[in-house]
């Protein structure tokens, strides 16, 4: 029997927040096998780590900073919030491990997965799910390392830790304590079954083109997949990428097209999409978020793109971003053995960029997810990169929603 409990407190003082959390945990009768903890980046990681390790000595641990706090079935935690998701499953097996990524992220990811499997006493076995939380920037390399062990036979789902203002103040939390350039891997062998979904809240605008040149191609496990692939698009259809993209968006970058610089805010509603295939006749897209205009009109992105790929200009709005979160959660619940009637709770990864764009309407997102999960316990974090499984392949994307549903 699987049981989930969520606890959220909101207080700018880490010490006071943990005192509130302690009182709430005292009222919960559960012995978790896995503890997920996410929190506003302004909190003190060392205090949070000390609290969790003292309270849940034998549990696997995964967590880190989340942009602007967390959400749960109780609503939006908001600034200063800390959230715990406690997963109890006496008949299941869970393990976690954490590593600093170092110069070779793929190798380190592979090592972390083997360590997590050993911690679950399941060395050499295929997990039902791999859940990851990591520092942004080398997600493709991390997935490549994990795939050396499990291929695409096992879903890899998770997020990239975030801060509150995109200044690099993100951290990750595992059994060894807080990290700034780390990866936490959890392996789940649930006795109640797991459902999952990985989607976005955008649609094609109609414009598309071929990536004809990419920028510097990283080496040594830091992003090369197969073809020439990089996080900088230099040319689309033989023209400077930023100029083409600006035309596609109707000129939203006109003021920055020559000066260059950050374009995160301008592009949140106009990401690039890559066709990942059809499900029930509906095309699904992996999103790529352009974040900078560089030299000679190059576009820097938060996910790698291969030369020769057709990319689509996507468009979104607040309403779609609010509604889609609930739909993704519902899809994960329906994917459970026994469907949503077998639901014990869930874990939601919602892009921090989308969260910032939705703004004061974010309580509606939490409400939509809660309704789709039948008001069962869930925890939602806000990330700067999302990982998920779509059409039999594990991928990294931006501005995405990743949902995991746990069966009883």
Spans of model-derived segments:
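Short beta-strand/loop segments at the ligand-binding rim of alpha/beta enzyme cores
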Residues: 375
């Amino acid at each position: 029997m699987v049981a989930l409990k969520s606890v959220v407190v909101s207080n700018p003082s880490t010490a006071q927040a943990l005192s509130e959390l302690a009182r709430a945990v005292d009222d919960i009768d559960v012995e978790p096998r896995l503890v997920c903890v996410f929190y506003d980046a302004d909190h003190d990681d060392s205090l949070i780590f000390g609290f969790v390790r003292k309270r849940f000595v034998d549990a696997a641990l995964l967590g880190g900073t989340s942009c602007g706090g967390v959400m749960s079935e109780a609503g939006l935690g908001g600034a200063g919030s800390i959230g715990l998701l406690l997963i109890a499953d006496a008949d299941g097996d869970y393990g976690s491990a954490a590593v600093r990524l170092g110069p070779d992220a793929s190798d380190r990811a592979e090592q972390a997965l083997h360590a997590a499997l050993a911690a679950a006493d399941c060395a050499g076995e295929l997990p039902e799910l791999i859940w990851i939380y990591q520092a942004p920037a080398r997600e493709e390399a991390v997935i490549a390392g994990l795939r050396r062990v499990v291929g695409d036979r096992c879903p890899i789902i998770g997020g990239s830790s975030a801060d509150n203002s995109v200044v690099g103040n993100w951290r990750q939390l595992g059994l060894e304590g807080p990290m700034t350039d780390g990866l936490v891997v959890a392996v789940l062998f649930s006795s109640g079954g797991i459902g999952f979904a990985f989607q976005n809240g955008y649609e094609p605008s109609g414009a598309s083109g071929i990536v004809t040149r990419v920028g510097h191609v990283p080496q040594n496990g830091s992003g090369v997949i197969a073809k020439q692939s990089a996080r900088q698009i230099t040319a689309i259809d033989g023209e400077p990428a930023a100029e083409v993209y600006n035309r596609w968006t109707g000129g939203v970058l006109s003021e920055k097209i020559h000066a260059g610089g950050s374009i995160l805010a301008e592009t949140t509603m106009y990401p690039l999409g890559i066709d990942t295939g059809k499900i029930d006749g509906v095309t699904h897209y992996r999103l790529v978020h352009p974040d900078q205009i560089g030299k000679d009109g190059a576009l820097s992105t938060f996910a790698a793109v291969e030369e020769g790929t057709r990319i689509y200009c996507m468009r979104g709005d607040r309403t779609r971003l609010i509604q889609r979160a609930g739909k993704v959660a519902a899809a994960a619940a329906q994917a459970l053995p026994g469907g949503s009637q077998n639901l014990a709770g869930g874990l939601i990864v919602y892009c921090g960029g989308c969260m910032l764009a939705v703004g004061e309407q974010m309580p509606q997102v939490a409400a939509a997810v809660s309704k789709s999960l039948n008001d069962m316990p869930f925890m939602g974090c806000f990330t700067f990169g999302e990982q998920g499984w779509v059409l039999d392949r594990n991928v990294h994307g931006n501005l995405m929603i990743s949902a995991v549903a746990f069966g009883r």
